[in-house]
Amino acid sequence: VDSSQLGHPRRVAVGLEQNRLAMLLAVLHRHGGLMLGDQDVFVNVVGGVKVAETSADLALLLSMVSSFRDQPLDRELVVFGEVGLAGEIRPVPSGQERLREAAKHGFKKAIVPKSNMPKEPITGMKVIGISRLSEALEHL
């Protein structure tokens, strides 16, 4: 995310559907209060991977917020959740397994949909359950 020098800011998505990026930016503006209308936005998914699963929505939005604010995300943070048009955070399949696997890989903090909160605590990991995009932004 960077200030645009052009009349129409660019939206470039590599590894993510262009329409998904446009929808996520609209939700971020409406329910996150971030004005990115005059910003160029570039999203590049590492390793040539194509993100088709909506569970990456929240992580993508938080990475864009991180870039816009020039505040890096915590390296020990894992994030997942589908973002709806009304700013709600929807659960994703296999949430418990995702958290356990993230903990095995050294992640110490997670921001996830409330419905994906673990039934039992995960050793060494603080899990934050959210239901709205605005709540996720408060935890950055």
Language model features: what each stretch is:
Residues 1-140:
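Peripheral, non-AAA+ core regions of ATP-driven protein-machinery
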